[in-house]
Amino acid sequence: MEPGPARPRLAPAARPGWGRAAGCRRRGGPARHGRASGQEDATTAGRQAGGGVRGEGTPAAGDGLGRPLGPTPSQSRFQVDPVSENAGRAAAAAAAAAAAAAAAGAAGKETPAAGKAGGESGVAKGSEEAKGRFRVNFVDPAASSSADDSLSDAAGVGGDGPNVSFQNGGDTVLSEGSSLHSGGGSGHHQQYYYDTHTNTYYLRTFGHNTMDAVPRIDHYRHTAAQLGEKLLRPSLAELHDELEKEPFEDGFANGEESTPTRDAVVAYTAESKGVVKFGWIKGVLVRCMLNIWGVMLFIRLSWIVGQAGIGLSVVVIAMATVVTTITGLSTSAIATNGFVRGGGAYYLISRSLGPEFGGAIGLIFAFANAVAVAMYVVGFAETVVELLKEHSILMIDEINDIRIIGAITVVILLGISVAGMEWEAKAQIVLLVILLLAIADFVIGTFISLESKKPKGFFGYKSEIFNENFGPDFREEETFFSVFAIFFPAATGILAGANISGDLADPQSAIPKGTLLAILITTVVYIGIAVSVGSCVVRDATGNVNDTITTELTNCTSAACKLNFDFSYCESNTCSYGLMNNFQVMSMVSGFAPLISAGIFSATLSSALASLVSAPKIFQALCKDNIYPAFQMFAKGYGKNNEPLRGYILTFLIALGFILIAELNVIAPIISNFFLASYALINFSVFHASLAKSPGWRPAFKYYNMWISLIGAILCCIVMFVINWWAALLTYVIVLGLYIYVTYKKPDVNWGSSTQALTYLSALQHSIRLSGVEDHVKNFRPQCLVMTGSPNSRPALLHLVHDFTKNVGLMICGHVHMGPRRQAMKEMSIDQARYQRWLIKNKMKAFYAPVHADDLREGAQYLMQAAGLGRMKPNTLVLGFKKDWLQADMRDVDMYINLFHDAFDIQFGVVVIRLKEGLDISHLQGQEELLSSQEKSPGTKDVVVNVDYSKKSDQDTCKSSGEKSITQKDEEEDGKTPTQPLLKKESKGPIVPLNVADQKLLEASTQFQKKQGKNTIDVWWLFDDGGLTLLIPYLLTTKKKWKDCKIRVFIGGKINRIDHDRRAMATLLSKFRIDFSDIMVLGDINTKPKKENIIAFDDMIEPYRLHEDDKEQDIADKMKEDEPWRITDNELELYKTKTYRQIRLNELLKEHSSTANIIVMSLPVARKGAVSSALYMAWLEALSKDLPPVLLVRGNHQSVLTFYS
């Protein structure tokens, strides 16, 4: 009987008293239970002892070479079992003995050697397992047979099979079984080790005995890839985090289990049946050749040879080929740099240069293809009308006949396109055959020189004609560049294959081969026909058979004269034949003229069909990316090939509209310029991607060069002006307009474009260059580390700092996550992307920097030391004032004050921002909606909001990791679901009206988002800190919101020197080139404050005083040691003057600056170790209470202002 699939079994615990686990939990599936009850009796002893790998005495069937017959890679199993660290060798030995006894009983014989070996194995394994906490058991699938068959197998074939266990991470195999040498059936067993890395059997199973995933293509697919859902490799957390207490089984080890990739493959296979995919010949080569060979081949190439001569005609063709070949190489490089989907030129450009260029080119390229349909159809209709005119069977008149025939033709072409790509491809093959026959007809005709054709200028291959036609003979104001402009549209069409990239079986291989080979073949044909027609036909001929020369002339200079024809009449009159006069030269030369007409029909219709297919496919890809939301309806596809039927209809209508005009002489140059603009950007994309040096730019096609691509882009731009300068300018204006529109709209896409790569490279290079620049006072910028916590929980703090750092200095939003490290790390990784997006969305030029620490002080230290890069490091710490310090735990207050000391220790400036209403709005549920409503109707008083009053307001500097403050709306817009949001649209708490305090808090939180009006910024520059106190208000006045505010400067001075001090300060400010409206010198700062204010201060600090004079010395010392923040009597007396100064300054602030928009004031400094935290906090409270917004600023006492140039 064949061994059945293995059942995962949980090894019993080695510690006495532990029972067997009920099952092991599987990811995404139900719990797995133990073996069938039929085997329980045979294996009870082994299981209860917790010993062997198999947990029973029945060995698996072997192959006689010491290898088990299973498991196969898809059948491998493993489970993780808790192993007691105290499990000794006795348990393992008992298990081995039980297993040996069971095996002996089943086989009917006793094998002491085997028992001994098994015992030794168990001892060794038990000691090894005792070293760790977990054991991984790999179970042989052969052991999962039914109970009856397993016993019989043990006695039969499998009796001598090996029992295999894995040790040391699964790399070394411990085998208990037959010898590697075939014996004479003595039954002797021995124990041996061998390395699985040198064993082919175990190499086959690599990757199935571990949670780690082996490299596979499914891990690198995009979620929206054609193959279905992306298969996720195990996350780092799954491999690295501590295991849960409950044993589990790795889902990746179970071969028979369904996986996302397997399901996706099945779904994709089912949906893919019948989908038409083309190879490189039918999909690219044929299309490109048909698109390149247009009407020019048959009705304009002979005229070009007549104007430019054979030599310059070859130069014209070669120049066009250079442009198209370089573009073909660039297209091949981009197409082989990753999986290419539908969208052709749009897809290539957008994924290389980004949505801005891609969106602009995609729209005009799709439009150009749609109008190109009309151009080719009108060319076809004109040829048909000429035939009708020759036979005098016009329906109405020439212009209306072109409209009627064109309309009928485009309807038929639409039917072929809508019928499906398969039918369209078949039509292309038929048209190519006709085109090739027409070319062959011309080549054959050049060797057939009929007497009737000589009067029309065709003499066959003659050296006289070749020599005469080799040089140029420009007429009617034609020049080399005008001739080149007429020919170049005949060389376009090289993107016809790339435009249907989504319908190619292997775009990466098909596009380079098909495009480059098509360019080569068509160029050879163009040059061959140019040389042939220039060697056979003279420039001018009368078509009159009577113009032959019967007598030999000795003074002949023209080739016709040497060939006995006199066409001198054409020198002074207009003739109807010859290269210069007859557009139907190829029909005249050919062996069968109607076949040339068929070739013209084939060339026009094939090009029209290719454009009719390309335009909707490009437009559909553009609409799928939602670059232009108004066109989203055209993204829908129908049928098995996802055909863009709506795009077909739109293309049909555009083409029909231009067909009805029937005059495309003005539109044609614009279309050619649209194509050339696409070529230019494709070439520039390769140059740009190579210049950015992105590791992701590694095309499989190696035959490209970034500088050649740049030359190609420049050549395309030059050719645009050569063809038509005003059309080139119009194209540039349209591309620029669309680029600006897409840039303004900022589509929510991220394609890893070279623009992003170059931005990174530029930032990296400039950062490295900046690191070598020494600091200079003239280049000082405030680079602020703002302790915001969650950035949107303190909007006033964020906006005020942003006002003086925007486009001037660095702003980093520091957020200290506290709590369990494991949870905090997960939240930090989520917050990093979430809050950075929030800052960008709210147009905040700032960086979000989360850090995990045990407490706020430690986290702030980490940020101050490590935040930033090179010279782009913070130099100023910005904090919100701790408004709730009187009710808070004084240990938190002590920690808050220590942030100041830490900042000063590492030479940081410190800025403390205080609003009397407070800064933190995170306790208000739905704050973002309220903020927007406040901006719209600030007078509203009856706002209803969910308020969580149970949450204690934390310090205005940081929040713990669990306190998030981002709305669910933002989460949905960002495309992520919050794991632990603070704010929700639907709160379970009671809905209560917003109280007055919170209403004022919300109003205050938005005050810096508005224009500040004509008011004052009062600068109390009491102490010289290097100039930071003066620099910040100046920077504020340079911003649009603050530009109407005037700076008033307050300084301290002596009563008898007020005028002198004012003049000295005015002189200094003028040297600093800082405008001010007034300077006020305060001579009464040192006056004793009002008695009631002193009493109020004493009452405030009373709960925090030590009162050591009223206590015993030991008790006082102990209390000071345990609570170092307490204010001692000695300290209070020592700093009485400084205390009075803070109280007095508050009185002066209320007197002079109560109406100011904002007050910027010198921050008092407390000596570390001398001033307690409670006293320092009391100073700040007394100084800044009941005032307009206050900035307490203290620089690091290094100059940040200078009056030297």
Swiss-Prot record:
Activated following phosphorylation by OXSR1/OSR1 and STK39/SPAK downstream of WNK kinases (WNK1, WNK2, WNK3 or WNK4). Inhibited by bumetanide and furosemide. Residues 389-398, 448-479, 535-591 are extracellular. It is found in: Basolateral cell membrane. A motif (RFXV motif 1) lies at residues 77-80. Keywords: Acetylation, Cell membrane, Chloride, Disulfide bond, Glycoprotein, Ion transport, Membrane, Metal-binding, Phosphoprotein, Potassium, Potassium transport, Sodium, Sodium transport, Symport, Transmembrane, Transmembrane helix, Transport. The chain crosses the membrane at residues 280-309, 310-329, 361-388, 399-422, 426-447, 480-497, 513-534, 592-616, 645-665, 666-684, 708-725, 726-738. The keyword Acetylation applies. A motif (RFXV motif 2) lies at residues 133-136. The modification Phosphothreonine is found at residues 196, 200, 205, 210, 223, 259. The keyword Zinc does not apply. It holds the Pfam family AA_permease. This is Solute carrier family 12 member 2. It comes from Mus musculus (Mouse).
